[in-house]
Amino acid sequence: RHHARTHPAFYVTYSKNTVLRDIMLYHCTGMAVIAQFDENLTMERFDIRIHPVKKRVFTVTADGFHCIYCKGQILIKDCFLENQLDDPVNIHGIYGRIHKVLSDSEVLVELVEGMQKGVPLGKSGETFGVINNETMLDVSAEVLAEHKMLNRDYQYMRFAKPVKGLQEGFVVENKDYAPDVLVEGCTFQNNRARGLLLTSAGEVIVRDNTFRSAGAAILIEGDSNYWFESGATKSILLEKNRFIDCAYVPDWGEAPIQVSPSAKKYEDGVRYHKYLEIRDNDFYCFDDRLVSAQNIEEICMYGNRIHKTDSFEPIPGEKMKLEGVLRVTDKPHR
């Protein structure tokens, strides 16, 4: 990292119906937008661009739009993001790790990842998933009866009824925050790392965008052992996008589209992510790689076009690298 992420341009928290429109941002020493526990958030014609006169080679020193535990709809429309020092968009929740089981309805929960310290995971009345950290599949869904922040590392949770099979090491996730996402008409280019990081259980649509990403243009992940970023997806549609010479830095992506949750232990007939549809996109590729995916139930691909380029030396790899994928079809659910 270039230096400490000291000052985001916008910090939006516990808000509703926030619109950031017609904004030109040249630089900030942090993320452009941090949004947390918000309902209905719009970034429209919000550009992050290199200054036309100054000689600075990067724009913001971290992510563009970083949304944590939001709900309702996140709309990102007609935006232009370039030259950030991290991903343009990251949408996710937070897994809290069960540090200690106090009773069959009480747990001490730890925030493990350093940048999540001090974040309250929810409040009484909200629904939490109790999740097996090895499979990352839900064990149960429970209503939170009581919540207390003990310090920046630990918080106390009491559920409304006893929970069978509570174990230390399992994780919890607030299920009330799972936004629908629409990303449309945007350009994402020339930044460090990846493109869109999408982990939300809402309806996710990515349509008519242009990607020039050093790593994966689309990364669908989720993990319970490092970043602790949550969000098993149910339905993601990638439609009419242009993926131009993406994934030329292997450390940041195995293919232009990558699905790679951290769980490597599977249960029969069930996967962490559910459905990904890739249709009518244009892939401009300097090698064969299109999709690298694991731990997802179904991928549907049809109507896509592949255009060969010679922009970079080819990187060895399969067109479709799959592990633990239950079905690949050309027949959409919609």
Show which residues each predicted segment covers.
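Short "repeat-start/strand-capping" segments in structured domains, especially the N-termini
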Residues: S15-V19, Q36-T42, G72-L75, P179-L182, ...
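Ser/Thr/Gly-rich low-complexity blocks that favor extended beta-strand/coil architectures
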Residues: Q116-R152
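Extracellular beta-strand-rich solenoid/capping regions of secreted or surface-exposed proteins
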Residues: A4-S15, G30-D38, F65-I68, N174-K175, ...
